[in-house]
C-alpha cells in the first residue's frame, strides 16, 4: 500500500508531499487507522537514559517539526518519537525550493532552515496529543539570533519544553543555519554545555524530575574533532549524543539531478560516514554516554549495523520516506537478530 501512496506523493513537489504526508498521518492517528495499516513490530524493550523504550527504533527530528502528527506516528510502531527542530519564535525558514529528492540514491537534500511555528505552537500540539510513549523534543536557535547569543534561544526552549519532554535534543549541527555548527567546537561548545547543564539542574529541582539532554552532532568532523566533542560532553555531564545530522558532502550523489543543490544530504549516501562517527564516539565514550544513531538507515541491516557499532538506539527519517512504515518492523527485527551484548 505504501508503494502506491509513494508513487502518488512523489508526483508532487517534495515539500507539498511532505506537508500532505503529515496531514494524512495526523488524520490517520486521530481516527485510529494507522495501527491497522502497519504490522506491530516485535517487542524489543530497551532501557536507556532512565527511560523505557518498547523498541530501539525511533523517528528522527525534522519529519514532524511542529508536533502536528504525534498520535499518527505513535501508531506506526516507533519505539520513540522526536519532534522539532523548534525555535523560540516562529520562522519561515529559507526560500523555496529547499527540499530535493534524489531517488536514484535513496537520498534527500534539504536547506529548510528550521522552518517551524515556534515552541508555543509545538507545546500546544504536544499537550493535545494522546501519545504517552517516549517523546524527544529537538530545539534550535532562531535564524536572526546571533551565534554569540545562541545559548539564550536554547535556554528559552529548554525552559518551555522541559515539563513535556521525555528527553531534549540540542541541535548544534544543522548546516542550514549560518554559524550553527561552530557551536560544536572549543569554548563555544563548553560554554553552551555548561549553561545547559546548569539550567537542567535548576529545572530538575523545580519540576521534580530530571529530563535527559542529548546533543546532536554532524558527520563531517574529523576523528580528532569527534573525540574532543565526546570529551566535552562527558565533562559537562550531558546524557546522550545523537550521531548524526545531515552531511555537507556529496559522495554518492555526484552527477545526479539536484545532487549539487546546497544543503544537508541525508539518506543512503550518509550511512557510512554516520556509522563511522558512531564507532569513533563509542571508542571515546566507553559506555559513559549512550549513542543514538541516525543517518542512512534504509534497510533493517543498516539499523543493526548502527547498534553493532556502539549505538543504543537508532532513528530513521529519509529511509521512512522511501520505504514507509515497513522499515520500522524490518529494523526492529534486524536488531533483535543481533547477538546479545553484555
Curated annotation (Swiss-Prot):
EC number(s) from the headed UniProt entry: 1.3.5.2
Binding positions (substrate): 65, 110-114, 171, 176, 245-246
Alphabetically ordered keywords of this record: Cell membrane, Flavoprotein, FMN, Membrane, Oxidoreductase, Pyrimidine biosynthesis
Molecular functions (GO terms): dihydroorotate dehydrogenase (quinone) activity
Comment on bound cofactor: Binds 1 FMN per subunit.
InterPro entries to which the protein is assigned, alphabetical: Aldolase_TIM (IPR013785), DHO_dehydrogenase (IPR050074), Dihydroorotate_DH_1_2 (IPR012135), Dihydroorotate_DH_2 (IPR005719), Dihydroorotate_DH_cat (IPR005720), Dihydroorotate_DH_CS (IPR001295)
Pathway annotation from the record: Pyrimidine metabolism; UMP biosynthesis via de novo pathway; orotate from (S)-dihydroorotate (quinone route): step 1/1
One of the GO biological process terms: 'de novo' pyrimidine nucleobase biosynthetic process
Location in the cell: Cell membrane
GO cellular component, one term: plasma membrane
Membrane topology: Peripheral membrane protein
Cited PROSITE patterns: DHODEHASE_1
Pfam families on file: DHO_dh (PF01180)
Cofactor(s), names only, from the UniProt record: FMN
Active-site positions on this chain: 174
Reaction catalysis annotation: (S)-dihydroorotate + a quinone = orotate + a quinol
Chain sites annotated for binding FMN: 61-65, 85, 138, 171, 216, 244, 267, 296, 317-318
Function according to Swiss-Prot or TrEMBL: Catalyzes the conversion of dihydroorotate to orotate with quinone as electron acceptor.
Family note: Belongs to the dihydroorotate dehydrogenase family. Type 2 subfamily.
Summary of subunit composition and partner proteins: Monomer.
Protein name stated in the entry: Dihydroorotate dehydrogenase (quinone)
Gene name per UniProt: pyrD
Amino acid at each position: 500500500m505504501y508503494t502506491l501512496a509513494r508513487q502518488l506523493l512523489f508526483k508532487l513537489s517534495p515539500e507539498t508531499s511532505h506537508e500532505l504526508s503529515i496531514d494524512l498521518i495526523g488524520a490517520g492517528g486521530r481516527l485510529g487507522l494507522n495501527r491497522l495499516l502497519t504490522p506491530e513490530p516485535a517487542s524489543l524493550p530497551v532501557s536507556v537514559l532512565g527511560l523505557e523504550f518498547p523498541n530501539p527504533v525511533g523517528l528522527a527530528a525534522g519529519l514532524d517539526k511542529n508536533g502536528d502528527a504525534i498520535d499518527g506516528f505513535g501508531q506506526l510502531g516507533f519505539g520513540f518519537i522526536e519532534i522539532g527542530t523548534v525555535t523560540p519564535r516562529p520562522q519561515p525558514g529559507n526560500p523555496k525550493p529547499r527540499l530535493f529528492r534524489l531517488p536514484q540514491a535513496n537520498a534527500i537534500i534539504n536547506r529548510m532552515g528550521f522552518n517551524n511555528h515556534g515552541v508555543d505552537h509545538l507545546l500546544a500540539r504536544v499537550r493535545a496529543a494522546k501519545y504517552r510513549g517516549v517523546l524527544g523534543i529537538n530545539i534550535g536557535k532562531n535564524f536572526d539570533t546571533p551565534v554569540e547569543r545562541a545559548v539564550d534561544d536554547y535556554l528559552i526552549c529548554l525552559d518551555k519544553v522541559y515539563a513535556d519532554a521525555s528527553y531534549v535534543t540540542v541541535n548544534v549541527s544543522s548546516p542550514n543555519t549560518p554559524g550553527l555548527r561552530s557551536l560544536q567546537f572549543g569554548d563555544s561548545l563548553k560554554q553552551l554545555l555548561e549553561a545547559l547543564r546548569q539550567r537542567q539542574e535548576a529545572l530538575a529541582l523545580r519540576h521534580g524530575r530530571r529530563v535527559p539532554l542529548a546533543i546532536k552532532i554532524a558527520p563531517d568532523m574529523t576523528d580528532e574533532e569527534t573525540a574532543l566533542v565526546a570529551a566535552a560532553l562527558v565533562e559537562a555531564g550531558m546524557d546522550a549524543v545523537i550521531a548524526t545530522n545531515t552531511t555537507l558532502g556529496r559522495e554518492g550523489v555526484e552527477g545526479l539531478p539536484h545532487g549539487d543543490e546546497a544543503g544537508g544530504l541525508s539518506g543512503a549516501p550518509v550511512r557510512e560516514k554516520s556509522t563511522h562517527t558512531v564507532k569513533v564516539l563509542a571508542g571515546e565514550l566507553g559506555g559513559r554516554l549512550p549513542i543514538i544513531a541516525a543517518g542512512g538507515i534504509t534497510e533493517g541491516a543498516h539499523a543493526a549495523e548502527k547498534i553493532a557499532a556502539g549505538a543504543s538506539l537508532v532513528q530513521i527519517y529519509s529511509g521512512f520516506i522511501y520505504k514507509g512504515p515497513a522499515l520500522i518492523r524490518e529494523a526492529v527485527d534486524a536488531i533483535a537478530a543481533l547477538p546479545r551484548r553484555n
